[in-house]
Amino acid sequence: MAKNIGLNVAVPEKDCDDVNCPFHGSLPVRGQVITGKVVSERMQGTVVVERNFLHKVQKYDRYEKRSSKIHAHMAPCLNAKIGDEVKIAECRPLNKTTSYVVVEVIKE
């Protein structure tokens, strides 16, 4: 039985026994909710999500494209592949570089 995590996301159909799963484990989510594209899934249980945004250059009063890469934990009940659009939510630090968890696969 999946629990309500407080976000407007679809609950995954598969069950998992991961303690760091926001739906089936005991990991609370809070803070930022970001959408981005998966660019790497080579780490075990972790994906790299690239987020694109616009940054204003004050001198020229114009915008430039920038991007940042965020490491996010992916539970076994969610199956995201490279190129998928995912929604990630902030959580407590899980390791040195991971403070986000994948909560929904938007577009495959």
UniProtKB/Swiss-Prot annotation:
A GO cellular component entry from the record: cytosolic small ribosomal subunit
Pfam family for this entry, one: Ribosomal_S17
Assigned keywords, A-Z: Ribonucleoprotein, Ribosomal protein, RNA-binding, rRNA-binding
Domain of life: Archaea
GO molecular function, one term: structural constituent of ribosome
CDD domains: Ribosomal_uS17
Keyword presence, Phosphoprotein: no
InterPro entries listed in its UniProt record: NA-bd_OB-fold, Ribosomal_uS17, Ribosomal_uS17_arc/euk, Ribosomal_uS17_archaeal
GO biological process, one term: translation
Subunit and partners: Part of the 30S ribosomal subunit.
Family per record: Belongs to the universal ribosomal protein uS17 family.
HAMAP family: Ribosomal_uS17_A
Function, in words: One of the primary rRNA binding proteins, it binds specifically to the 5'-end of 16S ribosomal RNA.
Name used for this protein in its record: Small ribosomal subunit protein uS17
The species this protein was found in: Methanocorpusculum labreanum (strain ATCC 43576 / DSM 4855 / Z)
Taxonomic classification: Archaea, Methanobacteriati, Methanobacteriota, Stenosarchaea group, Methanomicrobia
